[in-house]
């Protein structure tokens, strides 16, 4: 009875999809900008933008996003993912349209995750 194969449930990691592709195609996966939604509490949600090039000013992009969509946001420094922009609410489509119209990213290089 000691040979039982039991899987223990672990915490959900919303960034696990981005980390899964790092082993095989490191150069190809770095080209994408990932726009995700995370559920906070109740009906509240958080939109994260990850994978923008380092030469962009994250604070200027955040300032324009906050002004355009009338929401609050911040730039978070993650040890594995680098800088990540966080916005309040479900802003996935708005952010992807904004990044394409501003010429920051091409539409083919945006991946939208969530629900």
From Swiss-Prot:
Similarity comment text for this entry: Belongs to the SUI1 family.
The keyword Protein biosynthesis appears for this protein: yes
Alphabetized GO MF terms: translation initiation factor activity
The keyword Protein biosynthesis appears for this protein: yes
Function as written in the Swiss-Prot or TrEMBL entry: Probably involved in translation.
InterPro entries: SUI1, SUI1_dom_sf, SUI1_euk
GO process annotations (BP): regulation of translation
Protein name per UniProt: Protein translation factor SUI1 homolog
Organism ancestry: Eukaryota, Viridiplantae, Streptophyta, Embryophyta, Tracheophyta
Keyword annotations: Protein biosynthesis, Translation regulation
NCBIfam families: SUI1_MOF2 (TIGR01160)
Gene3D superfamilies named in the record: SUI1-like domain
